[in-house]
UniProtKB/Swiss-Prot annotation:
Annotated positions of the Phosphoserine modification: S100
Protein name: Phosphoglucosamine mutase
Catalytic residues in the record: S100 (phosphoserine intermediate)
Any one annotated GO CC term: cytosol
Species annotation: Bacillus cereus (strain ATCC 14579 / DSM 31 / CCUG 7414 / JCM 2152 / NBRC 15305 / NCIMB 9373 / NCTC 2599 / NRRL B-3711)
Amino acid sequence: MGKYFGTDGVRGVANKELTPELAFKIGRFGGYVLTKDTDRPKVIIGRDTRVSGHMLEGALVAGLLSTGAEVMRLGVISTPGVAYLTKALDAQAGVMISASHNPVQDNGIKFFGSDGFKLTDEQEAEIEALLDKEVDELPRPTGTNLGQVSDYFEGGQKYLQYIKQTVEEDFSGLHIALDCAHGATSSLAPYLFADLEADISTMGTSPNGMNINEGVGSTHPEGLAELVKEKGADIGLAFDGDGDRLIAVDEKGNIVDGDQIMFICAKYMKETGQLKHNTVVSTVMSNLGFYKALEANNITSDKTAVGDRYVMEEMKRGGYNLGGEQSGHIILLDYITTGDGMLSALQLVNIMKMTKKPLSELAGEMTKFPQLLVNVRVTDKKLALENEKIKEIIRVVEEEMNGDGRILVRPSGTEPLIRVMAEAPTQEVCDAYVHRIVEVVKAEVGAE
């Protein structure tokens, strides 16, 4: 990660850390790096429903126009919608203004290259080098060479028509409950599922600029679980603020997370001959029950570091077409170049329809191990990982587990924390393992 770019673009509190001045520079320098080899390049911009989106969009557009780029504004649209349209509209770059599942005061800017994929580390480093220069030496076109701006608010519909054709038949006879987090999918998802002839009930579809992710969406699926039970729905689908995540709820009101959704997709894709190299890519945070369920179905798993960009890198490297995270980022690389909540939702409902099985039965084929994650504030993350007493307690606990559980001790990527996670057959055993390790970490390198 660089000075400005984190694992998912540039993020910060809007108008404090992510200022219009910085957004202008990101537009100018980012636009230049991605389009310098093209005459009159085209750049598309989408945003979620945050109140700061208009402010940052205006600054970004100005920066891009100052390099001579033609800018097309898509309005409110999901992140995967921008990724798809960047390639579909032959744009040289796409930009999404969103902080995903973060609270309303945050916002972010992420770029997509002409192929619809997020930027490489090298491209981000090139943009950062320009941002840090004291003098802006980039060309400044004038007159008719300046860029112009246009609106293409139909882009959302073009994207919906594309993902809609990935399913085999309509969803008539199904009652689907939707939670759109008052975010980018608020008008898109209800239209999509109604268009597929499902009966729908909705929540989180009244964005006012201030309420994105507030007690709703994929990070707060409890409200959707209540709606499913109240309406007698067959399935609940919860998206996050920018629509790149999906968490589901079965017909009984049980939450179905990203690991379970990946397993359901993997099993169905294998049975129908669609799972490339018989492999699913996931992160080290996926539940042990996920790996055991894959193993029982003779499906291979490939693990990466935490973060959907690392999942994507491994998928591209190995030629795999299914990957994701427990948090609900599901990547279906045959169709879209990033995690896509609505596309994942379509596939999940399609599998229910094709197998004639309720979601509870499909998800029940994977038994989740109880899991506990505790964050310990430390003085030095590096010292913690090298500490002999910490290494010893991890070794002792792993020996006691004897393969019937899992320990993961890793540093936070952004804070002075060590994350201690365990999975075991019962919650009681799981909690005991974690607290034994946490006590040693605190005694050796604890900051409090």
